[in-house]
Amino acid sequence: YTYPARKIGTFLADADLTHVSNEVSFVEGCVGYTGMVFCSKPKYIETLKASGVDIVELTGNHNNDYGSKYNKSTIEKYIELGWDYFGGGLNSEDASKVLYKEEKGNLLAFMGYNWYDTVYSSRALAGSSSAGANSYSVEKLTKDIKEAKDRGAVVIVTFQFQECYSYPSSDVVYPICYKPLSFPDQKKVFRQAVDLGADIVIGTQAHQPQTYEVYGDGLIFYGLGNLYFDQDEWIGTRQGLVLSLYVEDSNIIQVKITPIIVDS
């Protein structure tokens, strides 16, 4: 069950902090998927262990596919393992918390939001007594970034946006995916986070890499693509990006982009 990480796990684990977005809950008896409903066998958490995961992002829109109870039990497993999480939680209050991590004298603030389900569907979002993703609002984003900047933290913002499986016109799934950015609003939303003070903004929804840019005083990566999600229908969904952030004196001084490909 560590097979997916056999060639990349050591590289990922070498970081002081390894952050991954996982949007599939672990379900006993999981036998695969039907349509767009996903789960994972519990033993595949060994892949995350082999990758040296420290922080799990929970902004994804599939963690509640088998019900929030499995999302809850999955989060409880992360807690048991001593892993931190953000962008989702055991309830809406827990999901909205900003994760602060101090590493080698640097303060980092991780904050994540599910933009897509806030706008189009609520099934993936946390409720007052149910697990799920953190909802998005400009007011919440503004408040979170201001508080983090006031504390002198490096602000890392992540978004779950519209997912695109492939951009070529011959095999595109959704018409909106004909363009590099999935929605006209994506650039606006991501740039607004930088305008509010974010140091780096990352789209963790993409099934294949999207564009990136230096904008104002920040960096924006609109989509990193797949890591362990096994979509081999198109070459695009077998590709991904791993970001290595180098931080000194609570400033991002370098970002290294490592391209990856799933060799099935």
Locate the predicted segments by residue.
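Acidic, metal/ion-coordinating pockets
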Residues: Y1-S264
